Amino acid sequence: MELLCCEVDPVRRAVPDANLLHDDRVLQNLLTIEERYLPQCSYFKCVQKDIQPYMRRMVATWMLEVCEEQKCEEEVFPLAINYLDRFLAGVPTPKTHLQLLGAVCMFLASKLKETIPLTAEKLCIYTDNSIKPQELLEWELVVLGKLKWNLAAVTPHDFIEHILRKLPQPNEKLSLIRKHAQTFIALCATDFKFAMYPPSMIATGSVGAAICGLQQDEDVSSLTGDALVDLLARITNTDVDCLKACQEQIEVVLLNSLQQYRQDQDGSKSEDELDQASTPTDVRDIDL
C-alpha cells in the first residue's frame, strides 16, 4: 500500500527588514533608478509591425491567469510584464512568438522572485504544448541577452510597503489596503497605457484608489480626497495632477474589468439556462 502525503511545506519568506523600510534612503534610491527599467518607446508605433495592442492585452491576461492559478508571488506577474514590454520595445517580434515570449518572461520572473520557480514543462502545458521546453530554454537566453541581464527591475510592488508605512492608517486596515492595491497593480500591468508610467506613480495611484474604494464601505482612513492625494504625492515626489490622473485611470480600468466580468457571468448564465431542464434548479444556486 502506498501512502500519499498531502502536506505541503509553507513558503519560506524573510521577515520585513525594519532597517530598510524605515530608511528613507531606500525609497529615494528606488525613485532614482526606477525609470531605467521602463520601455523606451510606445513600441506599437515604431517597432512592432505584426503585434497590436489587443494582442498584448490578451497575452498579458493569459499570463495573469497562469500566475494566479500557480499562486505565484505578487511580484512575479508585473515583473514578467516589464520584461515583455522592454523586449518588445527593442526587438521586432512576429505575433506567432508572443505567447512564447510571455512564457519566457514568466519563467525568468519566477526564477528571480519565487522560492520554487515555475518549470519550463509546466509553462509549456499552459500553452497547450504549442511550444516545447527546449524552445523555451533557447528563448530564455535570447531574452536575457536583449535585456542585457538587467532583471532586477523596479516594480510598483517595491514601493507599496514604503507608502503604507507613511500613511496614518490603523494596522488592522493595512492588509486589506495592501491586497486591493496589489490587485490594481496587476490590472495596470494588463493595460499598455500604464507601461511607461513610473512604477512609483502606479503604486501610489493604486494605494490611493484602494483607500478611496474602501472608504465607500467603511472608515479606513482619517484622510480623504485632496488631502490623501497630497500626502501620497509627497511620499513619492509625484506631481499631484499627474497622480490624480493616474488614479482616475486606475479606477476606470477597474470599472471596465468589473463590467467585463459581469458580462461574462451573464453570458455563462444564459448558456446554463439552456440546459436547465436536465439540471436541478437548486444546483445552479450553489456558489462554489
UniProtKB/Swiss-Prot annotation:
Show the GO cellular component annotation of the record: chromatin; cyclin D2-CDK4 complex; cyclin-dependent protein kinase holoenzyme complex; cytoplasm; cytosol; microtubule organizing center; nuclear membrane; nucleolus
Q: According to its UniProt record, where is this protein located?
A: Nucleus; Cytoplasm; Nucleus membrane
The UniProt entry, under Pfam families, shows: Cyclin_C, Cyclin_N
Question: Phosphoserine occurs at which residues?
Answer: 270
Query: Any idea which residues bear Phosphothreonine here?
Result: 279
The UniProt keywords, alphabetically, are:
Cell cycle, Cell division, Cyclin, Cytoplasm, Membrane, Nucleus, Phosphoprotein, Ubl conjugation
KW Cell cycle (keyword) present: yes
- Which molecular function term from Gene Ontology is one that the record holds? protein kinase binding
Q: Would the keyword Nucleus turn up in this protein's UniProt record?
A: yes
Domain Cyclin N-terminal positions: 26-151
User: What are the start and end residues of every segment in region (Disordered)?
Assistant: 264-288
Q: Which InterPro entries match?
A: Cyclin, Cyclin-like_dom, Cyclin-like_sf, Cyclin_C-dom, Cyclin_N, Cyclins_cyclin-box
The record's Gene Ontology biological-process terms are:
adult locomotory behavior; cell division; cellular response to X-ray; G1/S transition of mitotic cell cycle; long-term memory; negative regulation of apoptotic process; positive regulation of cell population proliferation; positive regulation of G1/S transition of mitotic cell cycle
Q: What does the PTM comment state?
A: Phosphorylation at Thr-279 by MAP kinases is required for ubiquitination and degradation by the DCX(AMBRA1) complex.
Oligomeric state and interaction partners are given as: Interacts with either CDK4 or CDK6 protein kinase to form a serine/threonine kinase holoenzyme complex. The cyclin subunit imparts substrate specificity to the complex.
Q: Quote the function comment for this protein.
A: Regulatory component of the cyclin D2-CDK4 (DC) complex that phosphorylates and inhibits members of the retinoblastoma (RB) protein family including RB1 and regulates the cell-cycle during G(1)/S transition. Phosphorylation of RB1 allows dissociation of the transcription factor E2F from the RB/E2F complex and the subsequent transcription of E2F target genes which are responsible for the progression through the G(1) phase. Hypophosphorylates RB1 in early G(1) phase. Cyclin D-CDK4 complexes are major integrators of various mitogenenic and antimitogenic signals.
Question: Which family does the record assign?
Answer: Belongs to the cyclin family. Cyclin D subfamily.
Name-wise, this protein is: G1/S-specific cyclin-D2
Which organism is this entry from? Sus scrofa
Q: Which gene encodes it?
A: CCND2
